[in-house]
């Protein structure tokens, strides 16, 4: 069993679409980023890569590489997941916390879970997404951006049993 933690944050800005968990959310601004700025998928990708000891999203998809400019984060997640599968892992479970004052995430969470389950080739019961605010404290509370944390549990595909390291 391997556990990974991921964190991502992006500042609001620009006129691009707001994409969170692979869902386009109507809002006045997008998030500033080299790719599409999807904080959920970036945090999830980092959690999974960390659990598999494959580095992080910046190592795999550097923001200095023009090939990833404006990249669809679902594609990045699927490529990371392919590499993790190649190491013999499957998802045990995934828990995601979105931290944002606005917009409200609750109406979009079911589709985020569907997207994550599709991309990670797992059952929706293995994926949890929730959202919270910071009660108007800090940069997310002031509406300056969105943050996300993710924790992923990986298990070996062959047996599905706990592996002690």
From Swiss-Prot:
Catalytic activity: 4-CDP-2-C-methyl-D-erythritol 2-phosphate = 2-C-methyl-D-erythritol 2,4-cyclic diphosphate + CMP
Gene name, Swiss-Prot/TrEMBL: ispF
Cofactor comment text: Binds 1 divalent metal cation per subunit.
Family per record: Belongs to the IspF family.
Functional note: Involved in the biosynthesis of isopentenyl diphosphate (IPP) and dimethylallyl diphosphate (DMAPP), two major building blocks of isoprenoid compounds. Catalyzes the conversion of 4-diphosphocytidyl-2-C-methyl-D-erythritol 2-phosphate (CDP-ME2P) to 2-C-methyl-D-erythritol 2,4-cyclodiphosphate (ME-CPP) with a corresponding release of cytidine 5-monophosphate (CMP).
Associated pathway: Isoprenoid biosynthesis; isopentenyl diphosphate biosynthesis via DXP pathway; isopentenyl diphosphate from 1-deoxy-D-xylulose 5-phosphate: step 4/6
Pfam families the UniProt entry points to: YgbB (PF02542)
GO molecular function: 2-C-methyl-D-erythritol 2,4-cyclodiphosphate synthase activity; metal ion binding
GO biological process, one term: terpenoid biosynthetic process
Descriptive protein name: 2-C-methyl-D-erythritol 2,4-cyclodiphosphate synthase
InterPro entries: MECDP_synthase, MECDP_synthase_CS, MECDP_synthase_sf
Residues that coordinate or bind a divalent metal cation: 8, 10, 42
Record site feature (Transition state stabilizer), residues: 34, 133
Oligomer and partners: Homotrimer.
Binding site for 4-CDP-2-C-methyl-D-erythritol 2-phosphate: 8-10, 34-35, 56-58, 61-65, 100-106, 132-135, 139, 142
Required cofactor(s): a divalent metal cation
Enzyme class: lyase
EC number(s) stated in the UniProt entry for this protein: 4.6.1.12
Keyword list, A-Z: Isoprene biosynthesis, Lyase, Metal-binding
């Amino acid at each position: 069993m391997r556990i990974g933690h991921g964190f991502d944050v992006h500042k609001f800005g620009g006129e691009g679409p707001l994409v969170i968990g692979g869902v386009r959310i109507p809002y006045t601004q997008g998030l500033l980023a080299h790719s599409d700025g999807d904080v959920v998928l970036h945090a999830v990708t980092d959690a999974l890569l960390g659990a598999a000891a494959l580095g992080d999203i910046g190592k795999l998809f550097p923001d200095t590489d023009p090939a990833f400019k404006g990249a669809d984060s679902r594609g990045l997640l699927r490529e990371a997941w392919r590499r993790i599968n190649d190491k013999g892992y499957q998802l045990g479970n995934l828990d995601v916390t979105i931290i944002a004052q606005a917009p409200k995430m609750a109406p979009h969470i079911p589709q985020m879970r569907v997207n994550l389950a599709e991309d990670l080739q797992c059952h929706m019961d293995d994926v949890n997404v929730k959202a919270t605010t910071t009660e108007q404290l800090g940069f997310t509370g002031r509406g300056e951006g969105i943050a996300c944390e993710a924790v992923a549990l990986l298990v070996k595909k062959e047996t599905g049993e706990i592996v002690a390291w």
